[in-house]
Amino acid sequence: MDLMYIRDSNGIMDSGYLKHFEADFDITTDLDYVTNDFEIKMSLPSSDEELFFSENKIKTIVYVEGTEYGGEITGSIIDTDEKTITYTGRTWRGTLSQWIIEPPAGQDYRVVSGNLATILRQLPLSSYLDVADTTYTTGTFQFDRYITSFEGITKLLTNADASLRIGIEFHEGDEYTGIATITIQPTRDATGMIEVSQDYNDNIKLRIQRDHNTPKHLICLGQGELKNREVIHLYADENWNIVQTAIPGAYPTEIYDFSSTTALLSDGMKRYKELIDGHELIDVAIKDLDIRLGDIISARDRLTNENVAAEITNIIWRCTDYGDHKTEEYEYKTKVRR
């Protein structure tokens, strides 16, 4: 894939292909592991006319057409010993973290419903982003107070069983404006098409981690004192579904102390889900496989012959271009779907 640029140098626009670089793009939907940034390392140029960033003077958009690997360069690191310059920036998703969703004046929460594209257009977004029309809708949804557009939109689309894709795509006659389009799409269940395992092929590295210290019993402690304190017991069944029905002998047991909450059950369920999500982690490094953020894939442990469905929540794309030689590598992180 070719990494392209659109540069604005004091109002003079130019565009083209980046050459001779090492790039690392990190994109994620994981609210507990928010990266969504990139680095591009190049040799120091011989003149400032070749720079791709200079504060208040040079702005540059980089992108791989039709993918999420792109964004705005927002900084640079110059190493005179190595004679290199490393450009840093936020991916398209990363720009969503720069904006805050606030409740409307006089209201406790921002509450929305209806067409998802219409809703997104009413939220604070970067001027580099546009929202494509969609037929997807949502019922009544309440945003948390004062959260980033990234977190709010991610939760909104998850609730609607949808996902988003952000990228620059050109069609005949289009101008190189540097505007990326947000497209709302269904979550793609690829478990019947894509299975990864240790014996998949020579191009895959699979790491499956299981934490057997994940609690099977969570005691949630809320408001009140001593015998009057609110206490809720939550359990995980054999399939790690959260239930309130007591399971005799369930262990390990943990305590969740949240005396400030007025919604102990919902907060306790949320905390328990976070713990369970960390019970099984699957990291995949693979080449030549069509996977995108939000896809559901199947992963098989060769030793136990156990299959689990996992959602792609993080993709790292690494690319090196040495002129006559080019390499690409993808690393995927997942969360097990239950």
Predicted feature residues:
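Oligomerization/assembly interface segments of phage tail-like spikes and tubes
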Residues: T29-S47, E82-G94, C220, E274-A285, ...
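Short beta-strand-centered interaction patches in the first periplasmic/extracellular domains
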Residues: I77-L96, D133-T214
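Short beta-strand and beta-hairpin "edge-sheet" elements
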Residues: K59-G89, S298-E329
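Amphipathic, non-transmembrane alpha-helical segments in extracytoplasmic/periplasmic proteins
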Residues: I40, G89, E102-D130, D144-H171, ...
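Short coil-to-beta transition motif at edge beta-strands of beta-rich domains
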Residues: E49-V62, L289-R300
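Acidic, small/polar-enriched beta strand-loop surface segments
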Residues: M4, P186-Y322
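Surface-exposed cap/loop segments at beta↔alpha junctions
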Residues: S47, S54-V131
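Solvent-exposed edge beta-strands and adjacent loop segments
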Residues: M1-Y33, S197-I208
